[in-house]
């Protein structure tokens, strides 16, 4: 027998914590006005019948739902949430567009990461690194009768075959979990209904996990340029490419095409690449990429693109025009992919950039609609989307309201050389803690002693001077992402510099440097240095 409950949709999940803390019997507890998102959380494998408030504010009417959870978007966060929800007994459906390798507007099961993001990009990174390794091998006695050549067409075909395989795996995972996969474009009709290609589906909860799409600035000739989606699936390898942007996507593709022997020019509006990263890392990676032949054009903003009679392209900036490009690529950020979903028509609030506004539990302004991943523009990383999806399922189907934990989230830039980081930058640590100790190492790795190449490694620890806790860990050099992933556990556990010092290193390795740096490169004492000083003097002394 179904139970009808009337609750206020405006209440937050914090009500649950308050209710649990009160000395009430179960009947009294159930009479409290709990949020709709927490009703019937333990109900398994059945259609929910509750009282849903009508949009015009009239008396609630009984509602019958096809699913407990309906998800729009089959990317990393959505798949995690759907699969876990199904495992907990919920009836789940998901809608996604057909497979496509090029456009974020036509995606496929697996989303950005699997089809036009992390996975294909990393495969391109692997392909491009061989040229550097061929150069390194000469110093180790390797000789080649002829210079190795790269077959772009066969590589792209192999890459696409792998993406198809991964998409198939994702579909099998959903199928085995009992999730209904619906192919098509989903659009919100009301807080509990989604239209997929003309057919309506109702659900107690709706999750939006549609990710993001590349952003191209509105300048004359922008239609002549490509974005990061297209760059992963070009019919021919660039001969000379202009990459507009100074973020991680720009640097990763700069390294890729440089390794594949294209002439690479990077145009950035700022003085430095990677805004938001540690300042020393920013300087070091640009220097190392320049040594490898990549040309950086700083403080240059794109103004127009033109095409010549010979088919080449010219890029005009505020400082002049550079001609002769076979490709011009924009890596100028991404935007949440919230267009044509009907979100605002049902009351979901969006930020200026189109991101879905959510609370700390991933709930939108509409009580029955939730959102995770890049579409919320919180921390746009695949593992973070997975975490958000897992936390949401605990909130909805395990009677365990759970917030995603964003402290000490590691990240990487698969540039060449790559970057790994976790925790605070030096600049952030100074602002938050004031007194900090900085440990750095800048050295030539063992491999470079025989290769003869000018490769170097930079490593950095940011330590709180008062508590000795390691606040930040940064590295730029070979295998940096792999090394930093392990140390992320240490920062998550709030280990101290003394813990690092007490750890035996692996020799010879670059990683051991993190546990053998004993003497601070510099000590920043914001409280002491600011005493008796003001203005720019105090800021400079504090390292700001």
Curated annotation (Swiss-Prot):
<comment type="function">
    <text>Catalyzes the reduction of glutathione disulfide (GSSG) to reduced glutathione (GSH). Maintains high levels of GSH in the chloroplast.</text>
</comment>
<keyword id="KW-0150">Chloroplast</keyword>
<feature type="binding site">
    <location>
        <position position="249"/>
    </location>
    <ligand>
        <name>NADP(+)</name>
    </ligand>
</feature>
<dbReference type="InterPro" id="IPR023753">
    <property type="entry name" value="FAD/NAD-binding_dom"/>
</dbReference>
<dbReference type="InterPro" id="IPR006324">
    <property type="entry name" value="GSHR"/>
</dbReference>
<dbReference type="InterPro" id="IPR016156">
    <property type="entry name" value="FAD/NAD-linked_Rdtase_dimer_sf"/>
</dbReference>
<dbReference type="Pfam" id="PF02852">
    <property type="entry name" value="Pyr_redox_dim"/>
</dbReference>
<keyword id="KW-0934">Plastid</keyword>
<dbReference type="InterPro" id="IPR036188">
    <property type="entry name" value="FAD/NAD-bd_sf"/>
</dbReference>
<dbReference type="InterPro" id="IPR012999">
    <property type="entry name" value="Pyr_OxRdtase_I_AS"/>
</dbReference>
<dbReference type="GO" id="GO:0050660">
    <property type="term" value="F:flavin adenine dinucleotide binding"/>
</dbReference>
<feature type="binding site">
    <location>
        <position position="269"/>
    </location>
    <ligand>
        <name>NADP(+)</name>
    </ligand>
</feature>
<feature type="binding site">
    <location>
        <position position="275"/>
    </location>
    <ligand>
        <name>NADP(+)</name>
    </ligand>
</feature>
<feature type="binding site">
    <location>
        <position position="121"/>
    </location>
    <ligand>
        <name>FAD</name>
    </ligand>
</feature>
<comment type="subunit">
    <text>Homodimer.</text>
</comment>
<keyword id="KW-0560">Oxidoreductase</keyword>
<feature type="binding site">
    <location>
        <position position="170"/>
    </location>
    <ligand>
        <name>glutathione</name>
    </ligand>
</feature>
<feature type="binding site">
    <location>
        <position position="382"/>
    </location>
    <ligand>
        <name>FAD</name>
    </ligand>
</feature>
<dbReference type="GO" id="GO:0045454">
    <property type="term" value="P:cell redox homeostasis"/>
</dbReference>
<feature type="binding site">
    <location>
        <position position="186"/>
    </location>
    <ligand>
        <name>FAD</name>
    </ligand>
</feature>
<keyword id="KW-0521">NADP</keyword>
<feature type="compositionally biased region" description="Low complexity">
    <location>
        <begin position="532"/>
        <end position="544"/>
    </location>
</feature>
<feature type="binding site">
    <location>
        <position position="246"/>
    </location>
    <ligand>
        <name>NADP(+)</name>
    </ligand>
</feature>
<feature type="active site" description="Proton acceptor">
    <location>
        <position position="507"/>
    </location>
</feature>
<feature type="binding site">
    <location>
        <position position="96"/>
    </location>
    <ligand>
        <name>FAD</name>
    </ligand>
</feature>
<dbReference type="GO" id="GO:0006749">
    <property type="term" value="P:glutathione metabolic process"/>
</dbReference>
<dbReference type="GO" id="GO:0004362">
    <property type="term" value="F:glutathione-disulfide reductase (NADPH) activity"/>
</dbReference>
<dbReference type="InterPro" id="IPR046952">
    <property type="entry name" value="GSHR/TRXR-like"/>
</dbReference>
<feature type="disulfide bond" description="Redox-active">
    <location>
        <begin position="113"/>
        <end position="118"/>
    </location>
</feature>
<dbReference type="InterPro" id="IPR001100">
    <property type="entry name" value="Pyr_nuc-diS_OxRdtase"/>
</dbReference>
<keyword id="KW-1015">Disulfide bond</keyword>
<protein>
    <recommendedName>
        <fullName>Glutathione reductase, chloroplastic</fullName>
        <ecNumber>1.8.1.7</ecNumber>
    </recommendedName>
</protein>
<feature type="binding site">
    <location>
        <position position="507"/>
    </location>
    <ligand>
        <name>FAD</name>
    </ligand>
</feature>
<dbReference type="GO" id="GO:0050661">
    <property type="term" value="F:NADP binding"/>
</dbReference>
<dbReference type="GO" id="GO:0005737">
    <property type="term" value="C:cytoplasm"/>
</dbReference>
<keyword id="KW-0285">Flavoprotein</keyword>
<feature type="binding site">
    <location>
        <position position="252"/>
    </location>
    <ligand>
        <name>NADP(+)</name>
    </ligand>
</feature>
<feature type="binding site">
    <location>
        <position position="76"/>
    </location>
    <ligand>
        <name>FAD</name>
    </ligand>
</feature>
<feature type="binding site">
    <location>
        <position position="113"/>
    </location>
    <ligand>
        <name>FAD</name>
    </ligand>
</feature>
<feature type="binding site">
    <location>
        <position position="77"/>
    </location>
    <ligand>
        <name>FAD</name>
    </ligand>
</feature>
<comment type="similarity">
    <text>Belongs to the class-I pyridine nucleotide-disulfide oxidoreductase family.</text>
</comment>
<keyword id="KW-0809">Transit peptide</keyword>
């Amino acid at each position: 027998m179904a139970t009808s409950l009337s609750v206020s949709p405006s209440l937050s999940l914090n009500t649950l914590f308050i209710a649990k803390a009160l000395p009430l019997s179960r009947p009294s507890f159930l009479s409290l006005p709990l949020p709709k998102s927490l009703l019937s959380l333990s109900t398994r494998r059945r259609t929910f019948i509750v009282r849903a408030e009508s949009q015009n504010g009239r008396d609630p009417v009984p509602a019958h739902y096809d699913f407990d959870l309906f998800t729009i978007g089959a990317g990393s966060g959505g798949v995690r949430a759907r699969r876990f929800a199904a495992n907990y007994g919920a009836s789940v459906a998901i809608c996604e567009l057909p497979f496509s390798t090029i456009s974020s507007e036509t995606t496929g099961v697996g989303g950005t990461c699997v089809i036009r993001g992390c996975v294909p990009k990393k495969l391109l990174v692997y392909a491009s690194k061989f040229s550097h390794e061929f150069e390194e091998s000469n110093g180790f006695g390797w000789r080649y009768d002829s210079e190795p050549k790269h077959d772009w067409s066969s590589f792209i075909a192999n890459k696409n075959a792998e993406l198809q395989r991964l998409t198939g795996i994702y579909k099998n995972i959903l199928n085995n979990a009992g999730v209904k996969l619906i192919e098509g474009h989903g659009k919100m009709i009301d807080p509990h209904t989604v239209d997929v290609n003309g057919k309506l589906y109702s659900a107690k909860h709706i999750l939006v996990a549609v990710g993001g799409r590349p952003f191209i600035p509105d300048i004359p000739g922008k239609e002549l340029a490509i974005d990061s989606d297209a760059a992963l699936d070009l019919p021919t390898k660039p001969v000379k490419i202009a990459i507009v942007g100074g973020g991680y996507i720009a640097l990763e593709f700069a390294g890729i095409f440089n390794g594949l022997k294209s002439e690479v020019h990077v145009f950035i509006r700022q003085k430095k690449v990677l805004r938001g990263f540690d300042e020393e890392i920013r300087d070091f990676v640009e220097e190392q990429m320049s040594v490898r032949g990549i040309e950086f054009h700083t403080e240059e903003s794109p103004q127009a693109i033109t095409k010549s009679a010979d088919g080449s392209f010219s890029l005009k900036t505020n400082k002049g025009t550079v001609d002769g490009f076979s490709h011009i690529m924009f890596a100028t950020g991404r935007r949440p992919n919230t267009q044509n979903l009907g979100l605002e028509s049902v009351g979901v609030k969006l930020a200026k950039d189109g991101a879905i506004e959510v609370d700390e539990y991933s709930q939108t302004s509409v009580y029955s609609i939730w959102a995770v991943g890049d579409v919320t523009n919180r921390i746009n990383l695949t593992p973070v989307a997975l975490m958000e999806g897992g936390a949401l399922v605990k909130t909805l189907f395990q009677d365990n309201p759970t917030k995603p934990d964003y402290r000490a989230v590691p990240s990487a830039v698969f540039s060449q050389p790559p970057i790994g980081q976790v925790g605070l930058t030096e600049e952030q640590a100074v602002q938050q803690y004031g007194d900090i100790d900085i440990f750095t190492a800048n050295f030539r790795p063992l491999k470079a002693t025989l290769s003869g190449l000018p490769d170097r490694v930079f490593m950095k620890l940011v330590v709180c001077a008062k508590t000795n806790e390691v606040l930040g860990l940064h590295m730029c050099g070979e295998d940096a992402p792999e090394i930093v992933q392990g140390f992320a556990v240490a920062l998550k556990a709030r280990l101290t510099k003394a813990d690092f010092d007490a750890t035996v290193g692996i020799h010879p390795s670059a990683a051991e440097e993190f546990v053998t740096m004993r003497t601070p490169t510099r000590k920043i004492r914001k409280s002491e240095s600011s005493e008796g000083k003001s203005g720019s003097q105090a800021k400079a002394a504090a390292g700001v």
